[in-house]
Design a protein with these regions (language model features):
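N-terminal positively charged helical leader segments and presequences
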Residues: 1-90
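N-terminal-biased segments
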Residues: 48-81, 170-206
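Generic structural signal for residues in well-ordered beta-strands
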Residues: 82, 160-164, 239
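Short, ordered loop/turn segments at secondary-structure junctions
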Residues: 87, 131-134, 221, 244-245
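RNA substrate-binding interface of SAM-dependent RNA methyltransferases
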Residues: 89-189
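Active-site/ligand-binding-proximal alpha/beta "capping" segment
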Residues: 187-230, 237-242
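Structured adenosyl-cofactor binding patch, chiefly the S-adenosyl-L-methionine
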Residues: 226-265
Length: 265
């Protein structure tokens, strides 16, 4: 994966009179390195709403890490096509790989807010967990995927985070590598452990880690069950706290994402 400095060099390569704050980005459902093709939604926004015409230069992402500087050759609002002029691999990327496994909130809007903000900050994979104490036992990812795409474009990134289908917390943990198997990764669980279990701050855990592969577990409104917490620790997850405030699930997930982002800035 490209580093943030690589991404900065890519952005700097644009013409000096372009204003990155007002930069428009479109998503290509098909990109082969020579041409980018937009689906009906993106084409309509590009050609009907923003009134781009053949010959205009546009910026297109492929959703898997590359941004293309293109010239529009077909301004059909139902299926636009653009010729690739320049390629910027790793555009808007970050020098870490972050998975946030988080229990969806009872209120869908709150979890979708997390998806949006985590995407803007920098997350690679979101896993909706169904915990023993989850109030929401079913979660559909369709809308979250659309929100992630919009946030990816808004935050000037080229890679859309992967959003998994929901899985039970215990199944996710059982299939998680043990600490011995995954020495290169850092696995953290934010949980209000009782008794003598020691928790360190997430900042301390990140400072002590020299790698780039991180997974963070965030529980539901009622937190993980003791059984889930024990299973996580047995699988090599380090107990951490996110500060002294009591946080909503979605707030905790965004703070954890931000802590990782700032660690590698």
């Amino acid at each position: 994966m490209k580093s943030r400095s690589d991404a900065s060099e890519s952005i700097a390569a644009f013409p000096k009179n372009s204003d990155i704050c007002d930069m428009e980005v479109f998503f290509a459902h098909e990109a082969d390195g020579r041409f980018c093709r937009l689906d009906a939604d993106e084409s309509g926004h590009c050609c009907r709403v923003l009134r781009h015409r053949a010959g205009d230069k546009i910026n297109v992402i492929d959703g898997i890490g590359t941004m293309y500087r293109c010239r529009l050759v077909d301004d059909n609002p139902k299926g636009a096509e653009a010729e690739v002029l320049e390629t910027f691999p790793g555009w808007g990327g970050h020098p870490y790989r972050l998975t946030v496994a988080c229990c969806p909130t009872k209120n869908n809007d709150r979890f979708e807010w997390f998806v949006e903000k985590a995407t803007e900050v920098g997350v690679d994979r979101i896993v909706p967990l169904i915990g023993d104490r989850s109030e929401r036992k079913v979660y559909k990812t369709d809308r979250a995927l659309r929100i992630a795409l919009s946030a990816t474009k808004q935050s000037l990134k080229a890679r859309i985070p992967q959003i998994d289908e929901p899985v039970s917390a215990k199944d996710f943990l059982r299939h998680s590598e043990t600490a011995e198997q995954a020495k290169e990764s850092l696995k953290l669980i934010a949980y209000c452990f009782e008794g003598d279990t020691k928790r360190i701050s997430i900042q301390e855990a990140l400072r002590a880690y020299g790698g780039r592969d991180i997974t963070v577990l965030i529980g539901p409104e009622g937190d993980f069950s003791p059984e889930e917490a024990r299973l996580a620790v047995n699988q090599g997850y380090i107990p951490v706290h996110l500060g002294s405030s009591r946080l909503r699930t979605e707030t905790a997930a965004v703070i954890a994402t931000t802590a990782v982002y700032l660690r590698y800035e």
